[in-house]
Amino acid sequence: TRRSSDLTKKAAYFALSWYYLWDVPFAPGQMLGDIGLKTRGWGNVSVENNHIDVFIFEFASILNWLSKEYSEPRFSQFAEVISTSMRQLLPYEGHLCGVAKCGYYPEVVQHTNWDYGKNGKGYYNDIFAPGWTVASLWELFSPGRAEQFFRK
């Protein structure tokens, strides 16, 4: 219904308010700065522990749908910013991004001085749950997969 679509649009604007539109500066010697991480397009996880993460799942697909539904290109443009930004820390041979093995994706990317765990700004926290990060990126990089699954 149109009402549901309008509510989805409002919710998307709220969710987008948690995404970075600028790049946090990192000091020389901080791992994230040394590998050239750009925070634009990353979502802030919470106001309490203030780190960025790849918690995206179907959000980019929803933004692309909203872009078409409302003829609003900013939604799809920011979905592309999110998508390209999330690719930065994909570890592969020669570009491990501070991760020990290819195929793992870092979680709890610390971009502020607020440190609720270990390592501090410019590093990953020692808390690491690779399962959900892989699931989130799988959804982001295979658009339409969930819809196709539920249509079966």
Protein language model features and the residues they cover:
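Short, small-residue-biased leader/transition segments that mark boundaries at the very start
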Residues: 1-4
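Long, well-ordered core segments of solenoidal/helical folds
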Residues: 6-30, 73-97, 152
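Hydrophobic alpha-helical membrane-insertion segments, chiefly the h-region
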Residues: 51, 146-150
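Carbohydrate-binding/catalytic loop surfaces
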Residues: 26-54, 95-136
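Charged interaction patches that mediate protein-protein contacts
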Residues: 63-66, 72, 76
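Positions within ordered alpha-helical repeat solenoids
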Residues: 14-17, 21, 65-68, 85-88, ...
